[in-house]
Amino acid sequence: MDKKEYCYYCFEVVAATLEHRKVRDKWNAKSWTRSIPLFVKFASGKGHDKQLRGCIGTFRARPLVTNLTYFSKQAAFCDERFRPISLGELALLECQIDLLVDFEPIDDPLDWEVGIHGVSIKFTANGIRYSSTYLPSVAAEQRWDQEETLESLIHKAGYYGSIRSLQITATRYKSLEIGCTYEEYLHNLELLG
């Protein structure tokens, strides 16, 4: 099976939602019962001009079809950082799925490699719990080192106080990235009839 089918399916879910119709399961998605954590991301543009349009996922392993269906809608319509994706912009989009694997708790929140690992942090400050994560591609795309990434993660979590005394719990992980364009999705639909 071509793993790009996962991306085709995400585009189908978003298109069906925007067109107020049922999802066509051309890929037998109901058979995708393997449980795995994942993130779904939509972006517009190409290369260095690529702009994120939505990215939401989970560390909770649930059946693949369940996570893909739910998080394709969440990334397209519910990421509060962006306006919801519209029908008119679908043709400009790429979909990327990150299947998350190889989770490892780490003692030092800087013990991971840029471009290889994603990192998830958790900490408590003033009685409030904070957490955030970056997928493996983020630090490399931003050209951050581990320290810059950690500082950004702390701010992403919503904490802006002193970071010197924070007791951070960190986990590193890897991802299997799969991507396709909307054009590839349409071409695949055409091939499947």
UniProtKB/Swiss-Prot annotation:
Pfam families: AMMECR1. Gene3D superfamilies: Hypothetical protein ph0010, domain 1. One of its GO terms (cellular component) is cytosol. Residues 1-189 form the AMMECR1 domain. Transmembrane segments: none annotated. InterPro entries: AMMECR1, AMMECR1_dom_sf, AMMECR1_domain, AMMECR1_N. PANTHER family: AMME SYNDROME CANDIDATE GENE 1 PROTEIN, AMMECR1 HOMOLOG. This is Uncharacterized protein C688.03c. It comes from Schizosaccharomyces pombe (strain 972 / ATCC 24843). The lineage of its organism: Eukaryota, Fungi, Dikarya, Ascomycota, Taphrinomycotina.
